[in-house]
Structures are given as structure tokens and as C-alpha cells.
A protein has these predicted regions:
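Juxtamembrane intracellular "pre-TM" segments in multi-pass secondary transporters
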Residues: 1-5, 181-211, 393-394
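Short amphipathic helix-loop junctions that connect adjacent transmembrane helices
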Residues: 28-40, 227-242
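Helix-breaking motifs and short loop linkers at transmembrane-helix boundaries and internal kinks
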Residues: 37, 69, 90-95, 238, ...
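Residue-level signature of mid-helix packing/kink "hotspots" within the transmembrane helices
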Residues: 51-59, 143-144, 252-260, 343-344
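Helix-to-loop junctions at the C-terminal end of transmembrane segments
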Residues: 58-69, 259-270, 354
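Structural signature of the two symmetry-related core transmembrane helices
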Residues: 72-86, 273-288
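Paired small-residue
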Residues: 84, 95-103, 285, 296-304
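Cytoplasmic helix-loop-helix junction between adjacent transmembrane helices
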Residues: 100-139, 319, 323
Length: 394
């Protein structure tokens, strides 16, 4: 922690509050939406609309970072989500709630891209993966703590979590605005400063593989974990909702425990072997879901998935940080869109397959798609300069 620049420490602390606040409202979103007397599909739109806007605004957010700098974009983005959450808390009908949550998606995209840009620009390559691990770990801790607080607030009112989320976001924004003062985070006055275009980034093989890996991770891991996996446990394995919540917490704790180690190994051994390790572990975890006929096997699969996710959640972003140059907000936004896009596509396809066939068919198809990651992991070039140079000399 002491090795990190102050601006990176600031982003990590601020993002912890963002993640905790989001965790506070996660349990209440579907129930609060349902309280307006709408269908389950309509409830789904409240959740999906936020993700869709995040997806389509990724490049726009990146352009804003290039023009105005990370500090201002982060603060305005957090402020937008805070205001939209406050408005959602006082929504009088479903359509108002949908509109306010949709508007919040743009703000979420803005502060996410700004956060990544701060990390990529502020740390050296030999510290990048560890920094990303700490950043992801902060999000995990916040996401674990949030739902417990949200559950207590829901006993007071379904609107209460949104009020609290709004306040927590203001705290996050104030921290960022007060401490993000590094000169390299301000908008440049040099019109000739090197700006990496998306076309330039796509010409790099490692960037293309990082992009594809992030998309597949969103599709096959993050998406189903938020959609069909809980339903599989309750409807197929006859587990309880409490069991789902408990196991998800255990999986997140395991992921958090391995995050720092994964980052250290990535900075020492290189991105390529860590991507391979993560891809293989995650593949086996997903295969375990297909054969899980008891809750004990589900628990084991989620623990293994937590380990694999620790390696996979940091490596692609570290690879992107290795290859970008100059003011690269649009490239970072484009990369963020990959994961968001996968999280939109994954639940739709896996949910459809579960409806027309069964959960195991959905898991099998998802595993088949994810297998592409194994091929990519063995084709990716090393992006950590020191490791790549040592291999060439050897």
C-alpha cells in the first residue's frame, strides 16, 4: 500500500465506498421495483437498463477523460449516480424508477473509466497487477459488506438503501475531488500530446486478446453468477436463499484472499502465465457446475471459481495498462465495454437455454463458449516488458 501513489490510494478508498454503496442497494432493487406492481420482466429491465447504458457510454466516458481529466470526470460521474439514486428513492411510479436508474448508468461508466485511467497512468508496469488486485479487493470488501447493511435498511423501508447509497457516493466523490490533484490527471493543454486511438489499440494482438478475454469472462462467469446460478441452486439443488448468499460470500472471500498473490505473480512472472492459470482453474470450476448434483459440489465449484476469478479479474486490465500510451481514455472505455457487453449477453443466452432445456444444458453451452479463453491464453504475447525482454535474451 505504501508503494502506491497518493492518487491511486485515493481512487481505491473512494471506490470502496462506491462498491459498498452499490452492495447496499443490490438486495432492494428487485423488491423495490416489484412494489410498484410490475411484472418480473419489468423488474429485470430496471437492472438491465443500468448495465446497457454503462455499455453504450463507455467510449463517450473515455473521451470525457481525455478532454477534462480523471479528477473532474470521476467527481461528476459519482455525483450523477448519487443524484439519480436520490431521485430513485423518491420515485412515485415504476417509470420514474426506470428513468432514474438508467440515467445512473452514464455516471457509473464515467467514474469507472476515470478510476482505471488513474491506475494505468500512475503506476509502473512492475506494480500494475498488484495495484489492480488491491483495487479489485477494495471493491470485493465493499460488495461483501454492502448487502448486509442493505438487508437491515430494507427492514426500515425499501427506499432507505437508495438514500444511504446517495450519501455514500457523495462521500466517495468528495474524497476523489479533494485528493486527486496530480498534474498528469488534469486535462492536457498540449494539443499534440499522444492520444492512443482504438484503431491503434486493436492493432495490438495482446489488446485484442485482453478484450476478448474480458468479454468472455463477463459472458460466462460474471453474467451467469448473477442470473442463473442462484436459480439453479434453489430450483435444481433445492437449496435455500440463505445458502446462496452464504456461498457467494465465501467465494468472494476466497477471491479476495488470492487477489494479492495473483497480482504479485503477474508482476513477477508476467501476464501470460497468470492468464493461463486463471483460465484453466475457471474452466474446471465451470465444468463442476455441470456435474453438481448436490449443494456440497456447488460450494466446491464456487470456491474454485473464486480462485480462478482472482487470477482472471486482474490480468486482462493489467495487459491493457501495459500496451496503452498517452491519454487513452477512449481505449480504456472501449475495454470496459467488453466486460459490460459480456454481462449483458451472458444472462440472456444462459437464461434462455435454461428455460427451453435445463440448467445443465445452459452450463454446458456456457463452458463451450468459455473454452475459447483457453485458446487465447496460450496465444497471447507477453506484455510485461521486463519479462518479455528476459525471455528474448534467454
Amino acid at each position: 500500500w505504501s508503494l502506491l501513489p497518493r492518487e491511486v490510494q485515493t481512487v481505491i478508498i473512494a471506490s470502496f465506498f462506491v462498491a459498498m454503496g452499490y452492495g447496499v442497494i443490490v438486495p432492494s432493487i428487485p423488491i423495490y421495483s416489484r412494489s410498484f406492481g410490475v411484472s418480473a420482466a419489468a423488474v429485470g429491465w430496471v437492472i438491465s437498463a443500468f448495465a446497457i447504458v454503462r455499455f453504450i457510454s463507455g467510449m463517450f466516458s473515455g473521451k470525457l477523460v481525455n478532454i477534462f481529466g480523471e479528477r473532474k470526470v470521476y467527481f461528476v460521474g459519482v455525483l450523477m449516480v448519487s443524484i439519480s439514486s436520490l431521485l430513485a428513492a423518491i420515485a412515485q411510479n415504476y417509470w420514474q424508477l426506470l428513468a432514474f436508474r438508467t440515467a445512473g448508468g452514464l455516471g457509473s461508466s464515467m467514474f469507472s473509466v476515470a478510476s482505471s485511467s488513474v491506475i494505468f497512468k500512475s503506476v509502473s508496469s512492475d506494480l500494475r497487477a498488484r495495484t489492480q488486485s488491491i483495487y479489485n479487493g477494495g471493491f470485493l470488501v465493499g460488495a461483501i459488506a454492502g448487502p448486509a447493511i442493505g438487508g437491515l435498511l430494507m427492514s426500515i423501508s425499501l427506499r432507505a438503501p437508495f438514500f444511504v447509497y446517495s450519501v455514500v457516493l457523495l462521500i466517495s466523490g468528495a474524497i476523489a475531488f479533494g485528493y486527486l490533484h496530480a498534474s498528469h490527471l488534469e486535462p492536457s493543454q498540449n494539443k499534440d500530446e499522444d492520444v492512443m486511438s482504438i484503431k491503434d489499440a486493436l492493432s495490438n494482438k495482446a489488446f485484442r486478446i485482453a478484450l476478448a478475454t474480458a468479454f468472455l469472462f463477463g459472458w460466462a462467469v460474471l453474467g451467469p453468477r448473477l442470473s442463473i446460478v442462484p436459480l439453479f441452486v434453489v430450483e435444481d439443488l433445492h437449496g435455500t436463499n440463505a445458502l446462496v448468499g452464504f456461498v457467494y460470500t465465501i467465494s468472494a472471500l476466497v477471491q479476495g484472499a488470492f487477489l494479492m498473490r495473483a497480482g504479485q505473480l503477474s508482476d513477477r512472472l508476467g501476464r501470460r502465465p497468470i492468464l493461463q492459470i486463471g483460465a484453466v482453474i475457471t474452466w474446471f470450476a465451470m465444468a463442476m457446475f455441470i456435474f453438481a448434483n448436490h449443494t456440497s459440489l456447488f460450494i466446491a465449484a464456487m470456491i474454485v471459481l473464486g480462485i480462478g476469478s482472482a487470477f482472471l479479474s486482474t490480468t486482462p486490465s493489467s495487459m491493457v495498462g501495459d500496451v496503452i500510451k498517452g491519454r487513452s481514455g477512449k481505449v480504456i472505455g472501449f475495454f470496459q465495454m467488453a466486460t459490460d457487453g459480456g454481462m449483458i449477453v451472458g444472462p440472456i443466452i444462459s437464461g434462455y437455454l435454461a428455460d427451453v432445456s435445463n440448467y445443465r444444458t445452459a452450463f454446458t453451452a456456457t463452458l463451450a463458449v468459455y473454452s475459447i479463453t483457453l485458446l487465447l491464453a496460450w496465444r497471447v504475447p507477453e506484455t510485461l516488458v521486463t519479462v518479455a525482454q528476459n525471455r528474448e535474451q534467454a
